[in-house]
Design a protein with these regions (language model features):
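Conserved DHp (HisKA) dimerization/phosphotransfer helix of two-component histidine kinases, i.e.
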Residues: 16-17, 34-89
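Glycine-rich/acidic phosphate-handling loop/turn and adjacent ATP-lid/helix
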Residues: 141-170
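Conserved catalytic submotifs in the C-terminal HATPase_c
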Residues: 89-99, 106, 139
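Conserved C-terminal segment of the DHp
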Residues: 13-31
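Short beta-strand/loop element within the Bergerat-fold HATPase_c
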Residues: 129-142, 149
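Conserved phosphoacceptor histidine of two-component systems
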Residues: 1-12
């Protein structure tokens, strides 16, 4: 993992240099396309550094700080709400009352956020039409099942792929769910998460 840390530090150094160049270009009133190119470079460096941070997190053991009585449906609603503000539709459907579990609230919120982002990337209509339906089902007294439907058929397992930023985050989301004693899988054009209610 040290090499990943070193790469991230190098990317951050390049970002500082690119930011310095952008300021000089802005002061010298250079053409707009040069400013745009530097902006894209900085955004790309940010994404690469973020991916490296996620890989570092994936390589470390998941340490949970569980709390009893966490309302899983509220954590999921909060994690998905930001996507509706960007125009991506995620529709929550709950077939049960509030579901409480003994979980790490913050790590579970991250996992749900990455699952929502992955669902939007893999939705049936990549052009943005159609919503992602998220259904919370209390399968038994001891576990809850959460499904993200409206996805297209994939030729790979998005939770084990590491093919790009979204898949890296889906792999980490699955690892967090598994650390809680649950599972995350892609089946029948759905993300299906099974989460125990007590640890």
């Amino acid at each position: 993992m040290q090499i990943v840390h070193d790469l991230k530090n190098q990317l951050n150094g390049l970002k500082l240099y690119a930011t310095f160049l952008r300021r000089r270009i802005e002061k010298s009133e250079r053409p707009g396309d040069e400013q745009e190119t530097i902006g894209k470079l900085i955004n790309g460096l940010d994404r690469a550094a973020d991916d490296l941070s996620t890989i570092v997190r994936y390589g470390q053991p998941v340490e949970l700080k569980k709390q009893a009585g966490v309302e899983v449906d509220k954590v999921l609603r909060a994690a998905s709400s930001g996507f509706n503000e960007t125009g991506s539709q995620i529709v929550m459907e709950s077939s049960s009352d509030s579901v409480q579990a003994e979980v790490d609230h913050f790590k579970l919120a991250d996992a749900f956020k990455w699952l929502c982002a992955g669902a939007i990337k893999h939705r049936q209509n990549p052009d943005g039409a159609g919503a992602i339906a998220v259904t919370i089902k209390a399968a038994t007294a001891s576990q809850v099942v959460i499904e993200w439907s409206g996805l297209r058929q994939l030729d790979h397992d998005p939770f084990r792929s590491f093919a790009g930023s979204d898949e890296i985050k889906l792999a980490l989301a699955a690892k967090i769910i598994e650390a809680h004693g649950g599972s995350a899988q892609f089946t029948d054009k759905k993300f299906v998460v099974v989460l125990p209610l007590s640890g």
